[in-house]
Regions:
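Conserved, well-structured ligand/cofactor-binding cores
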Residues: 2-231
């Protein structure tokens, strides 16, 4: 994760243009950028919570999309979704989890509690991707409705914390552990090459017994290795 992305930095609205379409949900009608894949609830959040410019991290969006795909598969097994709906959700969720549609998630980290709006942002983008891929209009909720189908059998209070865990594990596996391995290898190499260098140890502000610089560096290496194993 390279810090929390910003709206300005990603230019998430720059490609949307000035044309609008109308999206409808249980709360009524709202205007959305014509080419945007998000829907009414996401747009309301953009309108009502224009606070700061830090966006929800893409890694969390990708993890939440993975969960949507898995939920669709299970719902299909229990005949709560048709095979067509499962396939449409899984295809869209996979594309999102790969980062293909990162510019369709404009919400700030400053929003109402529990992540409900981000959950709906993912639901709406999946719904509209499915609509577009099957030749239906954006906002038609055909073949999958963002709430009734994409979010079926889920609660934000479960899905969002689960996505946090998934994102943390993926970042750990893909980013942190490989970097720690490189650091451990580098310290191991330095420990070996610096065994002939003698330095004075320190006890607080006083000189202590002599020791090899390689021994000191090997202690750093072992501490990092132990921390890696705990992770």
């Amino acid at each position: 994760m390279k810090g929390i992305p910003t709206i300005k930095g990603l230019g998430r609205h720059s490609a949307m243009g000035g044309q609008l379409r109308q999206e409808h949900d249980s709360m009524g009608c709202v205007e959305v950028p014509a080419e945007a894949l998000w829907g009414a609830q996401t747009q309301r959040s953009c309108n009502n919570f224009a606070i700061g410019n830090q966006l929800i991290p893409a890694e969390l969006i990708h993890a939440l999309a993975r969960i949507k795909g898995c939920c669709a598969e299970i719902n299909g097994r229990h005949e709560l979704l048709t095979a067509q709906q499962v396939q449409a959700i899984e295809r869209a969720a996979a594309a999102i989890s790969e980062g293909t549609h990162d510019n369709q998630f404009p919400l700030s980290v400053w929003q109402t509690g529990s992540g409900t709006q981000t959950n709906m942002n993912v639901n709406e983008v999946i719904s509209n991707l499915a609509a577009r891929d099957t030749g239906h209009a954006l906002g038609s909720h055909n073949p999958v409705h963002p709430n009734d189908h994409v979010n079926r059998s889920q609660s934000t209070n479960d899905a969002f914390p689960a996505a946090i865990h998934v994102a943390a594990v993926l970042l750990l596996q893909n980013d942190l552990l490989p970097e720690l391995d490189r650091l451990i290898a580098s310290l191991d190499e330095k420990a070996g090459s610096w065994m002939d260098i003698i330095k004075i140890g320190r006890t607080h502000l006083q000189d202590a017994v002599p020791l090899r610089l390689g021994d000191e560096v090997s202690a750093w290496r072992d501490q990092i290795h132990q921390g890696r194993e705990w992770l």
